[in-house]
Amino acid sequence: MAQFKRTLVTTALPYANGPVHLGHLAGVYLPADIYVRHKRLKGEEVLHIGGSDEHGVPITITAEKEGISPRDVVDRYHRMNLEAFLKCGISFDCYGRTSSELHHETAQEFFLELERKGIFNRRTEKLFYDAEGGRFLSDRYVSGTCPICGSTEASGDQCEQCGTHLSPMELINPKSKISNATPELRDTLHWYFPLGRYQAELERFVNSHEDDWRSNVLNYTRTWLKGGLNDRAITRDLNWGIKVPLGEAEAVGKVLYVWFDAVLGYISFTRQWAEEQGDRDLWRHWWQNPETRLVQFIGKDNVVFHTLMLPAILMAWNEGREDGIYNLADNVPASEFMNFEGRKFSKSRNYAVYLGEFLQKFPADTLRYSIAMNYPENKDTDFSWTDFQNRTNGELADTLGNFIKRSIDFTNSRFGGEVPHSCTVQEWEGLGIDWYATQSQLDQAYEGFHFREAATIAMDIARAANRFLTSAEPWKAIKTDPEAAGRTMALSLNLCHALSIALYPVIPETCDRIHRMLGFKGGVDGLVRKCEPILKTLLEPALPMGHKLSPESEILFRKIEDQEIQPELQKIEQLVREAEAREAGAIEVKIEFKPAIGFDDFQKVDLRVATVRAAEKVKKASKLLKLQVQVGSTQRQVLAGVAEHYSPEEMVGKNVLLVANLAPRTIRGEISEGMLLAVEGEGGRLFMVEPQGEKINGQSVQ
């Protein structure tokens, strides 16, 4: 493994089109902060970079719906999310914005360098143009009739009624959502990034990390690589975004695609931080020095943008250079999802707990601890109000808080607020805690991104401390053997100190309060010395005899009463009822039944069970898979708009339902001989209808 002298940590940029919720916190921002705080405690050089993703069509649509400017939208949510992060103790060194002038300059610099090298491909294509509005229309700005189900409210990217993924040109009677005029097809030039050019280099890069990257990261990435990497558009016709920095007429009215500009935010925000330090070139120390380790925290829905897209852009920049070479990520610890009361967080359906709202009711450290103990490292986990209440009351209040307060209050009342005894290493080791193993395991857990394990190890120290104090009974010993009671309290106070260090990355505000109650000025990070890991202080007692405590103690955690949780549970019950009713078809809004047909008409539809024998991606069509399906003794080719929901490997071997007598049609230059049936679940996720049973291939649906 490479030896690094410093660590650059980045976090996926939250989209400035809504507030962050607890799922975002659990998947990206809390684990990154825990890791960064641990590195700082070790006296290591570490930089924590984050910021807002502020471009793209959803933002312009929100602005138009509200009658405000895109700038107003991103200003609102950038401020809202930053305030929530700070209140939660997320310790960014810089939290930037992709709408900033410096970011625009950085992204344009990358574009121009790659354009100068001749890396981009230019491609003329036909897109809808609104002559009345004077602009080209992205897919979400076009509506019309779905060619599959006949819904008159289909959008240019998807029909919400039947779930079919579409292109604007497939709509019947298309209309502009801006002017309601019928758009016309016009030629427009766009720039494409040739991902396939870097496929071999990307494969080598990914394979070099097969022993240290998480399996989910490797699997997602290799699925894309196996399907072959296609050219990807990096420009689009839009008014809000980073302008294509070329003087030619074809570049007018075009901006950089948000996928290209957003991942460069990590670089521009580091440049911003450097300028704030008074050294404009300091950012190169973090991005272009091979002794710097780059660790990028993301959710699993962002994997390929950080394992393929950004590395490919940096590879293109580095091509042929002798200096100014960018580092690639050394690790991309993508988490799984944390669900909410058994269901996926969904902002569009308002099924979420938003971070800012949560922190108005409960302390940040109670949330940080609860999420750390449910960290979705290798599988989806679940946040529930009951679990949150139980962990706060049982583990934080009764175990940790109770021990700290008892130790400090008893020392203040019976020993004059001073550590009453010198603790020997033998006494420390006699507590029944293997300090060498504990310190090593704790360090390895934090370093290895195993944050649930780290929180558990630290809380186990608190449990052992409680058992020690309860069994020693210093309140009884003080009457007959004051010296024994003093030894007990000296050990207990040193345990308080150990806990303030072990738990600091997870619950920093609480540990700073413990630190101050122990008589220290400032917080735990005041103990940091360069290249001197504080965790090693766990190996022996740290508080000498006579060390003065604060005369005042605090209740670290108040218990959460049932009546505080009940409104939240009732709110969830209502949201679940609405979701279940929606799934069952009980909510009549949003449901449009098609016109009635006669039985004879229905009988004309030939639905049969088919088996997928082969599958591959369709070039230049990110939503389509080309499938070879067996129906009885015949084989057909079917194009299905499920590429964003199933990999080719996942489709092979499935039994599916095929509309077998649908007239063949050409899609993206390929013949499709039928249509497969799927249902749309929450968040637009498509699920194939998969018939069950033996020897059913070719059978008709009765």
UniProtKB/Swiss-Prot annotation:
Taxonomic superkingdom: Bacteria
The enzyme's E.C. designation: 6.1.1.10
One of the GO biological process terms: methionyl-tRNA aminoacylation
Positions contributing to ATP binding: K347
Positions of Zn(2+) binding: C146, C149, C159, C162
Cofactor: Zn(2+)
Short sequence motif named 'HIGH' region, residue ranges: 14-24
Pfam families, per the entry: Anticodon_3, tRNA-synt_1g, tRNA_bind
Location within or outside the cell: Cytoplasm
GO molecular function: ATP binding; metal ion binding; methionine-tRNA ligase activity; tRNA binding
Domain (tRNA-binding): residue spans on this chain: 601-702
Reaction equations catalysed: tRNA(Met) + L-methionine + ATP = L-methionyl-tRNA(Met) + AMP + diphosphate
Name of the top EC class for this enzyme: ligase
Subunit structure, interactors included: Homodimer.
Protein family per UniProt: Belongs to the class-I aminoacyl-tRNA synthetase family. MetG type 1 subfamily.
NCBIfam families, sorted: metG, metG_C_term, PRK00133.1
Function: Is required not only for elongation of protein synthesis but also for the initiation of all mRNA translation through initiator tRNA(fMet) aminoacylation.
PANTHER family: METHIONINE--TRNA LIGASE, METHIONINE--TRNA LIGASE, CYTOPLASMIC
Protein name as it appears in the record: Methionine--tRNA ligase
Organism: Chlorobium luteolum (strain DSM 273 / BCRC 81028 / 2530) (Pelodictyon luteolum)
Gene name tied to this protein: metG
